[in-house]
A protein has these predicted regions:
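Phosphate-coordination/substrate-recognition cap region in phosphate-metabolizing enzymes
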Residues: 38-106, 234-235
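Extreme N-terminal starter segment of soluble prokaryotic enzymes
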Residues: 1-5, 51
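Acidic, low-complexity terminal tails and accessory targeting/binding regions
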Residues: 2, 86-97, 143-149, 166-235
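Active-site metal-binding loops of divalent metal-dependent hydrolases
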Residues: 10, 157, 202
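Short glycine/proline- and acidic residue-enriched helix-loop micro-motifs
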Residues: 104-125, 222-228
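General small-molecule cofactor/ligand-binding pocket signal
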Residues: 5, 78-80, 198
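Loop-to-helix element that buttresses phosphate recognition and phosphoryl-transfer chemistry
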Residues: 11-62, 66-67, 116-131
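GST-like fold's C-terminal all-alpha helical module
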Residues: 126-157
């Protein structure tokens, strides 16, 4: 079973201004976001990636480029429209402070599976396309590169939250309980019977254990010995 590292783009100019960017063109990383993306890319250098699949929006492409440039080998680079940002419709480009006054805001917060943005996408449709794309890419990468393959998907906060909710077996109505910060790392491995979530919203720490991690089948009763159990003796 391959392993997918879900990376949110670094902080964007819209994040700083408090605007819901959505698919607005020209929204790029700010200086802090660029530094965040570089740090995440450096953190991933210990893992030989086979592919970097990214949303087509500029802030994700910029984050993906830093990851690709930091790799010693040359992972394949793919733009995937199915993991682009949610289509927020008329909400796109609006200040979050004003959107929070809309009646739909409370639906998005407490009952997101029922939320459809005006002249936009429903959160349920967003999750369906995103989860479908991640699972398709994961299966294709495992078929081509084997069960030890590790790849990255660079996407957006709500997209990654919805993928994690699916992997955790959570209803979409609970996905607002998940936090995904800019340039954070979340790690999922899809098994034959269920996904396993290793990490969520991580911005520090060694990831070299991914090079030695044994495939997950049954969950260890009691919690198991952790990542170090898969390391070679003496390491």
């Amino acid at each position: 079973m391959a392993t997918v590292i879900l990376v949110r783009h670094g902080r964007s100019t819209a994040n700083v201004s408090g605007m819901l960017a959505g698919r607005t063109p020209g929204v790029e990383l700010d200086d802090v976001g660029t530094s965040q993306a570089i740090r995440t890319a450096e953190r991933l250098t210990v893992v030989p990636l086979v592919a970097v699949v990214a949303s087509p929006l500029e802030r994700c492409e910029q984050t993906a480029r830093h990851i690709l440039d930091a790799q010693s080998a040359a992972p394949s680079s793919v733009v995937e429209n199915a993991i682009t940002e949610c289509d927020y419709g008329d909400w796109q480009g609006q200040p979050l402070s004003l959107l929070s006054l809309e009646k739909l805001w409370s639906v998005v917060q407490t009952h997101p599976s029922a939320a459809t943005f005006p002249r936009g996408e429903s959160l349920a449709a967003m999750q369906a396309r995103s989860v479908g794309a991640i699972r398709r890419w994961d299966a294709a990468i495992e078929a081509e590169h084997g069960s030890n393959a590790v790849w990255v998907a660079v996407s957006h906060g709500d997209i990654i939250k919805s993928v994690l909710a699916d992997a955790l077996g959570m209803h979409l109505d609970l996905f607002q309980r998940i936090t995904v910060d800019p340039a954070s790392v979340s790690i999922v491995r899809y098994g034959s019977t269920r996904p396993t979530v290793f990490t969520t919203n991580s911005d520090s720490g060694d990831l070299s254990w991914l090079n030695h991690s044994a495939p997950v089948a049954d969950a260890p009763v009691g919690g198991g010995a952790g990542h170090d159990a898969a390391l070679p003796a003496g390491s």
